[in-house]
A protein has these predicted regions:
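Acidic, low-complexity interaction regions
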Residues: 1-174, 179-184, 190, 356, ...
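Extended accessory and catalytic-adjacent subdomains in large enzymes
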Residues: 177-178, 193, 201-449, 494-541, ...
Length: 563
């Protein structure tokens, strides 16, 4: 518990102002209905335009806000003209903002910096510490891959916000009061719930200390160091788990079975929060699987098929130890397809079990971090890293990260439209590289032909030292031109490899594993070894977040334990 925590509270987004679309077919609509329609209009033209669940949910929440005369319309078809007009108006507003004069832009920037200084920092035990996003979330359509996608998220008021502070904090919303102000032993300065679908669901939100804050930096470093130490004991832990799979104690046996699956294949424990901190009852993980999610196959193989966190499907066949296969066979016996595989074990009992077999702080998430970091180290240690171009270096490292992301099942939804766009972009890139190579080859071949003729002419009319000098000059130019062709060919080959990799990883979220599960000292030490700038791999925000990793030696990646 901090002795003191002081700050100026959180801010609220500006309320929606009418954009002039307050009538439909000469029928007046409410400001809320206009806001809902305005904020839906972009979705008419992106990946949600054909999402039936999203559209159905939007209409569920929008319809009651419209006058009765408009409730019989077909949504979204009968609103198409309105949405097009709204998008045109939206683009015009963006254009107006881009045309602000310098003094106006400076004034906006000044106000932004003043807000940041006043609300973007807190004082924890007297020490100034940066806060993350100090503005509460605004009203919007709920974007996720779960069944609630397309429901309306209502705006937040001060009465919804609990403030974590050791002193009174004046309310920043005029005419309102905070729900509660008290000092808590947490890393957030405020918490509130967002209301989805007019009371259908509520989701907790937090205003955390910034990832760049000293406390967060220390926590991050500590997490990855714990994961490294855990890797050193992983073989010993796996032996214990295999022994406990045969335990006469049913709870211990179930805990060990779940741990085995998590340890071996990096599957999430289950019962965790998805996008927007929402727990979807249809989402499965290692501890929440039903009989229908697991199929026993021949040769000690099981097939797992379920919907995981963030509605990402998991569909894999895996080979397991014979004793584990035998226990799963017993576990499934006599159960209906809708029954849970485990009768006693939960995510909480698994974490308690892990603490009982390992002397140190441990959770399933830490196991996933350890496995991800160990696999990244293994992939990195397989390769040569000297004398690579920046593009080669980045592509090779991303290929290593791909294996980590596959282990963690970090997939993302890719629509047919996005696939087509990516394919077209790939084709254009290859065509452009092919044309560039062709131009280089044709230009160089013409020059080489001229040099060949010049060489013959010199031999016919010159001799001695002068001839030798001229032939040497031609030899140098020929080498330069051949090198130019070789470089162009290499560039073309690199483009083909890059495009092939991007296409293969189209539905993989490479960033999550790199940013949240993989020891950042590995890429940073590798960059030092290969004399590359870490900004090739990490964004500015990530580099700031991982500032603590900068002191790493250039050989750290060589010595890191792998899996």
């Amino acid at each position: 518990m901090p002795k003191s925590l002081t700050h100026n509270g959180v801010l609220f987004p500006q309320s929606f102002e009418s954009k002039g679309f307050n009538k439909i077919d000469n029928i007046e609509i409410s400001l809320l209905a206009e806001e809902m329609l305005w904020k839906y209009s972009p979705y008419m033209f992106n990946r949600f335009k054909n999402d039936e669940v999203f559209i159905k949910n939007v209409w569920t929440d929008l319809k009651p806000q419209l006058p009765k005369e408009l409730q019989n319309k077909e949504f979204p078809k009968d609103f198409t003209k309105l949405f097009v007009a709204m998008q045109v108006a939206s683009e015009n507003l963006k254009l107006q903002k881009s045309e602000y004069n310098k003094s106006h832009k400076k004034e906006i920037e000044k106000e932004k910096n003043e807000r940041k200084e006043k609300y973007g920092f807190c004082y924890k035990n007297g020490k100034k510490t940066e806060v993350g996003n100090f503005v509460t979330e605004g009203s919007r359509w709920f974007i996720s891959r779960g069944d609630l996608r397309g429901r309306w998220v209502s705006s937040v008021n001060a009465e919804d916000v609990e403030i974590n502070s050791s002193e009174k904090v004046p309310c920043t919303q005029e005419g309102h009061n905070w729900k509660k102000v008290e000092l808590r032993d947490t890393d957030y300065i405020a918490t509130y719930k967002i209301n989805i679908g007019f009371g259908t669901a509520y989701v907790d939100k937090f205003v955390w200390l910034s990832a760049n804050s000293e406390d967060k930096q220390k926590d991050n470093e500590h997490k990855y160091e714990k994961a490294r130490k855990l890797l050193l004991k992983i073989d010993e832990i796996e032996k214990t788990v295999l022994k406990d799979v045969q335990s006469k104690n049913k709870l211990k046996r179930e805990n060990a079975l779940i741990t085995y699956v998590v340890l071996t294949y990096g599957i999430r424990i289950g019962n965790d929060l998805g996008e927007d901190n929402f727990r979807d009852k249809n989402v499965r993980g290692a501890s929440t699987l039903c009989v229908e999610n697991m199929k026993l196959e021949n040769n000690n193989k099981i097939h797992l098929e379920f919907i995981g966190k963030d509605s990402v499907p998991y569909n894999e066949t895996m080979e397991i130890e014979p004793i584990v296969y035998e226990q799963f066979s017993k576990q499934l016996s006599g159960k209906k397809s809708s029954d849970k595989i485990y009768d006693l074990a939960t995510s909480s009992t698994v974490n308690a079990y892990l603490k009982s077999i390992y002397d140190g702080e441990i959770t399933v998430k830490l196991f996933r971090t350890a496995k991800a970091s160990g696999l990244l180290a293994k992939e990195i240690q397989k390769r040569e890293w000297k004398n690579l171009t920046d593009k080669e270096f980045k592509n090779n490292l991303m290929k290593c990260c791909l294996q980590t992301s596959l282990l963690l099942n970090h997939h993302k939804t890719v629509t047919e439209e996005q696939k087509e766009k990516a394919t077209k972009s790939a084709e254009n890139k290859i065509e452009s590289a092919k044309n560039a190579l062709k131009r280089t080859e044709e230009s160089a071949e013409k020059k080489l032909a001229k040099l060949k003729k010049a060489k013959k002419d010199f031999k016919d009319c010159l001799e001695g030292k002068l001839l030798e000098e001229k032939l040497n000059e031609i030899k140098i130019k020929e080498k330069e031109l051949k090198d130019k062709i070789s470089k162009a060919e290499k560039k073309y080959e690199d483009t083909l490899k890059e495009v092939e990799f991007k296409q293969s990883a189209l539905d993989i979220n490479l960033g999550t594993a790199l940013n949240a599960y993989s020891q950042p000292k590995l890429p940073i030490s590798l960059c030092k070894y290969a004399d590359k700038d870490p900004s090739l791999i990490y964004s500015k925000a990530q580099l700031k977040k991982f500032e603590w990793a900068n002191k790493v030696s250039k050989d750290f990646w060589r010595k890191y334990p792998n899996v």
